[in-house]
Amino acid sequence: SKIIEILETGELKALKELIEKTPVGVIEMLNLKGLGPKKISTIWKEMGIESIGELLYACRENRLKLYKGFGEKTQQNVIETIEFYLNNQGSHLYAQVEAVEPQITAYLQKLFSPQNIALTGNYKRQLEYVDEHENVVNSSNEMIKPKFLSAQPPELLEETPGSLLYKLLNGLKLRLYTGTANFSKNLFETSGSKEFIDAFTAIYGKPEFSDAEITDDKYLFSSVGINYIPPFLRETAKIIDKAKVGNLPNVIQPTDIKGIIHCHSNWSDGSNTLEDMANAAKEQGFEYLVISDHSKSAFYAQGLFEEKISAQHKLIDELNNNLTGFKIFKSIESDILYDGSLDYSNAVLATFDIVIASVHSILKMTEEKAMQRLIAAIENPYTTILGHMTGRLLLSRKGYPVNHKKIIDACAANNVVIELNAHPSRLDIDWRQIEYALEKNVLISINPDAHSIEGFKDIRYGVLVAQKAMVTKEQNLSSMNLQQFEEFVQRRKNSIRL
C-alpha cells in the first residue's frame, strides 16, 4: 500500500509526518560521515541534542562518550567530522578564525609584502563570529588575481571593481578590498560598522586620508579633535559622543584575570583531576580556582549527589592545606529546575563558597516561563552567579527568550553576579547587553566554563567581547586577587538571609 501511495501521489504521508516532527538539526546530522540513523536517534532522544552545534559542544564537554555505543575514539571522530562539515558552511566562530588567521596573514604578506596588507572587518572588530576574513590590499584586481594561481588555487566567488572574494581550501571566505589609490580609505571604512562609519562621516564629513600612514588611522581621530576609538568599539554612533567628552575607559585585558571561576573536573564531566587543574592554574599565574562541577540533576554529566559533594569538599580542604599562595574554592554549577528552584537543599547549598545557577534542561520556553524560572533562581539567596544567561550556542542554538533588562534588574536587586561565559560557542551574556548591567552596577564575571586545563585559555574570548562592552577590570569578578575574592565570598555568605 505504501508503494502504491508513492506511485500515485509521489510521496508517503507517514514519512512526511515523521520528517515534520523531526528537528531540522537532527535531519542535518545525517550529513555527518560515520553517524548512522541509530546513533543519531540516541543523540536526539536520549541526550536531547537537536543540532550539529549542540552535538559538538557536548563532545567537547566529554558527554558523548558516556552513552552506550560511544567511546573516546568515536567522540573524537565526531568532533573532527563536525569541524570539517562546519568549515564548509558559511559563518565561523571567532576562535575558529583565530586558529588559522596567522597562516592567512603570513600567506598574504608573502604575496603582497607586510606594508601592503592590513587586517580589517568583523574579525578585527572582535565580533563573536565571522563570515569572511577581510583584508585591505594595496594592489589592483588585475595584479592580485595572478598571484592566487597555484597548484590548488582558492576559488574566486565574486569580483567587483573594488574587491575580490575567495573561498580558501579550509572553507573560510577571504575578502580582499583592493585598489592602489584608496588603501587608507578602504581600511577606515571597513574597520567599523555601517552605523559607526555613517555617523562619523555625518558629523565630521569625509576624512582626508593619508597614504603616509596607511595602516594606522589614529590621525583621523586626532584631526577632528576626539579621542581615539579602537576598531573593537566602532559599533554604534554613541561611542563617538563618549570619545568627544573624554578618554575612553581602560578596558579589561587578559592579564587582568586573576582566578579561574567555573570549571569542571573529572568528578563530573571534566577531563582532568581537581589537583591537576589547581596545579595548572597556579603554574599559569592564577591565584585561585573555583571548581564548579555539575549538580545532581545533570545526570548526563555525572552530576554530584550529596555524598560526592562531601567527599569533594574533603579533598579540597586537603589540597588547600598543601597549597601556598593559591586556593581552591568550593562551588557547584547548580541546575535551575523548571520551577526555578535549585536542585539541592539550603543546607547543602550553604556548604559552597560560590553557587553558579544555570539552565541546562527544557530549553524550549516562552519568554514568560524563562523569566519566571530565571528570576526565581536569582532570588534564591544562595545564588552567587547567574550562569550563561540565555543558554545560546553561537551558530547552533538560539537562546531562550528573555527580557535582559529585567534579568539584570533582578540581579542588581539580589546582589547576583552575571557570568560572561567565555566559551567561544557561548559568549553569553551577549556583549550588547552588558552596558545596561554596568549602568546598574552589576558585576560581570568572565568565566571559561572549562572542562579541561586546555579550556582555561577560553578566558581570552570572554575578555575580547567584554572589551566591546567597555568592561574594566574593576567591573569583573574574576579580576579580583585572592584576598579580594576571599573577602567577596565572605561578604556574600554573610549577606544571606532566609
Identify the role of each PLM range:
Residues 1-131, 138-165, 169-173, 183-185, ...:
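Accessory alpha-helical DNA-binding modules that contact the DNA backbone or grooves
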Residues 331-334, 461:
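Active-site catalytic microenvironments in core metabolic enzymes, especially phosphate/sugar-handling
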Residues 117-119, 259-263, 333:
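Two-metal-ion RNase H-like nuclease active-site motif
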Residues 94, 266-267:
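Short acidic-aromatic active-site loops that bind/stabilize oxyanions
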Residues 126-208, 213-265, 271-285, 296-326, ...:
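Charged catalytic cores and adjacent phosphate/nucleic-acid-binding surfaces used
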